[in-house]
Amino acid sequence: MAKSKYYVVWNGRKPGIYTSWSACEAQVKGYTGAKFKSYPSKEEAEAAFRGEEATPKLAKEEIIWESLSVDVGSQGNPGIVEYKGVDTKTGEVLFEREPIPIGTNNMGEFLAIVHGLRYLKERNSRKPIYSDSQTAIKWVKDKKAKSTLVRNEETALIWKLVDEAEEWLNTHTYETPILKWQTDKWGEIKADYGRK
């Protein structure tokens, strides 16, 4: 079950404390100079809203809503791994991978980004991709998933997919920007499975 989060909006259409990302997003999406942040408890959110915390820094860049967001849902690490890609603006699921029996979170994030690159290239789209995994972003740029997961019969499927993804990266070019989703400033990525 997903943990509750509280979203403080200092600068937005209606400043206040919200209990869901969608409610918070409605106040800040497209709002110039929006300031907001998520907190794990109501008490922390209330203290922050009263100004008992340093005013949060403005995001270095606005969210690019015309983009693709990818994320992984995992049960255990290593454990069952699945991923999906969604339209950042609407939340519409554009692709998803059925659960893989054994894998790691980072491997799933890597596969999700590469799937996103392939998806956008097939559609001649130059939209950027957001991922909340710095590790997976680096692996994609290096064209190599540096996972320490053992290769055996149990992990054969995820390693087959990773090998295929690395092969694709080494035989194709792309101009798609891969951007880090700033969870601490923007809340959970749109593709989040809500299992944290």
Curated annotation (Swiss-Prot):
One of its GO terms (cellular component) is cytoplasm. Binds 2 metal ions per subunit. Manganese or magnesium. Changing residue 109 to Q: Loss of activity. Its main location: cytoplasm. Keywords: Cytoplasm, Endonuclease, Hydrolase, Magnesium, Manganese, Metal-binding, Nuclease. CDD domains: RNase_H_bacteria_like (cd13935). InterPro entries: Ribosomal_bL9/RNase_H1_N, RNase_H, RNase_H1_N, RNase_H1_N_sf, RNase_H_bac, RNaseH-like_sf, RNaseH_domain, RNaseH_sf. One of its GO terms (biological process) is DNA replication, removal of RNA primer. Its EC number is 3.1.26.4. GO terms for molecular function: metal ion binding; nucleic acid binding; RNA-DNA hybrid ribonuclease activity. This is Ribonuclease H. It comes from Halalkalibacterium halodurans (strain ATCC BAA-125 / DSM 18197 / FERM 7344 / JCM 9153 / C-125). The gene is rnhA.
